């Protein structure tokens, strides 16, 4: 019998099993902040490691960087964030609730059956006209008494130094990309990379979102995994397609079901003024389709802006033709937190067993599973041998050890945190140095020699 996969179930499991906790919990929390627990931080780190492996270590084109969160304010003036990084904000005059006007429009479109609803690129007048013409009501109180739409800048301000005046004002970065752009020449010079090449970064970003929500899907503090890939003008659309396919395959290799993802190509009127093409990979969350990964052709906009503002040369000299040009840039950008949420949702399963019992199981790909294996001694008398195996394996893998409760209950605990293989140390182990391995997904069991365990696990975690 099919089960309903809901966000309530995902959130409950995440809290109960140590994936994600509410932020500042003992003080009543802080809205839309979340802390990754012992299991969640392993999952998130594994997702980041997998991304870095495929986008940096296994790519002939790309190198990495780690830029400061705080940057010279001129960076954000040049990039357009100070003047233009805003969302359309409106308030309900009746209940004082605050909303993003574009999201109200998109939710209404979706409710009317529009397949790929989007109000990207709509100005305030067009948004207001749609809201008025369709008599869209406040989601909280049901009234239609809204304020005018105004633009709300999303950057967090703070102060640097001992004085709190306008000269000391500084921003928390709203994206990691600009640190890459301002370091383009440094990286190209020191790495001796030739176009085409990319610069990858994983790091925190901050946006004062008007309506965050849906668990970790939209938060004000989040982590990005971004690649800025620089190419010769005229080859950008070809590279845009290359990275679209690369990102798609990455998700499939790590176990995301193909029926749960789709491409949404931005229409011409949706595109940013500097974009030549943008495509999103959307994931089907329990609350509907949501953007997971954006792949944008940013042309030469960012490097040109920084060249004009800073006065520094951002051109590239082709060593073969001696032609000098500002490279175009393809940006595949994915939120680490959204990616983790997608993997959580995709992995979640409820299986009805013989006898009517239901087991909850997380079908993570072994490469991103928080624990690769769990060591389960059948009896306390076998603890010494079990610890020997545990200590042997944990030098190479993250391994759980559990000797409390019945073996059945221990299996269920490991199923709920997505451990792919449980290794049982039984009395036969003492005689022949073999162990029983239980497969999470099939629940089938088989015996393996202890000295073959490392190779077995290494093979299973490849992707």
Curated annotation (Swiss-Prot):
Q: What is its EC number?
A: 6.1.1.14
Any one Pfam family match given in the protein's UniProt record, by short name: HGTP_anticodon
The entry's substrate-binding residues are: 100, 175, 222-226, 331-335
**PROSITE patterns, A to Z:** AA_TRNA_LIGASE_II (PS50862)
Which keywords label this protein? Aminoacyl-tRNA synthetase, ATP-binding, Cytoplasm, Ligase, Nucleotide-binding, Protein biosynthesis
Q: Which GO terms describe its biological process?
A: glycyl-tRNA aminoacylation
Q: Give the EC class as a word.
A: ligase
What GO molecular functions are on record for this protein?
Answer: ATP binding; catalytic activity, acting on a protein; glycine-tRNA ligase activity; protein dimerization activity; transferase activity
Per UniProt, subcellular location reads as: Cytoplasm
Q: Which SUPFAM superfamilies match?
A: Class II aaRS ABD-related, Class II aaRS and biotin synthetases
- Which GO CC annotations does the UniProt entry carry? cytoplasm
Quaternary structure, per UniProt, is:
Homodimer.
What is known about what this protein does?
Catalyzes the attachment of glycine to tRNA(Gly).
Which protein is depicted? Glycine--tRNA ligase
Biological classification of the source? Bacteria, Bacillati, Bacillota, Clostridia, Eubacteriales
């Amino acid at each position: 019998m099919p089960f309903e996969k809901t966000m309530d179930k995902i959130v409950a499991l995440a809290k109960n099993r140590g994936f994600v906790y509410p932020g500042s919990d003992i003080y009543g929390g802080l809205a839309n902040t979340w802390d990754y627990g012992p299991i969640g931080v392993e999952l998130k780190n594994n997702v980041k490691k997998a991304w870095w492996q495929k986008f940096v270590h296994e790519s002939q084109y790309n190198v990495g960087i780690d830029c400061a969160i705080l940057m010279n304010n001129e960076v954000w003036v040049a990039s357009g964030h100070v003047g233009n990084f805003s969302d359309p904000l409106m308030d309900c005059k009746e209940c004082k609730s605050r909303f993003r006007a574009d999201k109200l429009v998109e939710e209404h479109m979706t409710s009317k059956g529009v397949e790929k609803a989007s109000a990207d690129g709509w100005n305030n007048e067009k948004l207001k006209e749609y809201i008025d013409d369709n008599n869209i009501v406040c989601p909280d109180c049901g009234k239609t008494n809204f304020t005018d739409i105004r633009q709300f800048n999303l950057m967090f301000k703070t102060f640097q130094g001992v004085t709190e005046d306008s000269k000391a004002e500084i921003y928390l970065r709203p994206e990691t990309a600009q640190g890459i752009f301002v370091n383009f020449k440094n990286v190209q010079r020191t790495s001796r990379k030739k176009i085409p090449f990319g610069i990858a970064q994983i790091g925190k970003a901050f946006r004062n979102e008007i309506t965050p929500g849906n668990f970790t899907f939209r938060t004000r503090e989040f982590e990005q995994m971004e690649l800025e890939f620089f190419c010769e003008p005229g080859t950008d659309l070809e590279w845009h397609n290359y990275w679209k396919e690369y990102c798609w395959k990455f998700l499939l290799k790590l176990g995301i079901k193909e029926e749960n993802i789709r491409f949404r190509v931005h229409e011409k009127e949706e595109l940013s003024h500097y974009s030549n093409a943008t495509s999103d990979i959307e994931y089907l969350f329990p609350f509907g389709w949501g953007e997971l990964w954006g792949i944008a052709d940013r042309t030469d906009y960012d490097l040109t802006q920084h060249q004009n503002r800073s006065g520094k040369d951002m051109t590239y000299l082709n060593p073969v033709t001696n032609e000098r040009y500002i490279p175009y840039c393809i940006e595949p950008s994915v939120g680490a937190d959204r990616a983790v949420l997608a993997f959580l949702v995709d992995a979640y399963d409820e299986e009805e067993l013989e006898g009517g019992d239901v087991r909850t199981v997380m079908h993570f790909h072994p490469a991103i599973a928080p624990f690769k294996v769990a060591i389960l001694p059948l009896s306390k008398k076998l603890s010494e041998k079990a610890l020997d195996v545990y200590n042997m394996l944990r030098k190479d893998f993250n391994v759980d050890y559990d000797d409390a409760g019945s073996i059945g209950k221990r299996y269920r605990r490991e199923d709920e945190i997505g451990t792919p293989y449980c290794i049982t140390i039984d009395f036969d182990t003492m005689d022949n140095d073999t162990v029983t391995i239980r497969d999470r997904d099939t629940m089938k069991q088989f015996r393996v020699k202890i000295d073959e365990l490392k190779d077995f696990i290494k093979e299973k975690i490849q992707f």
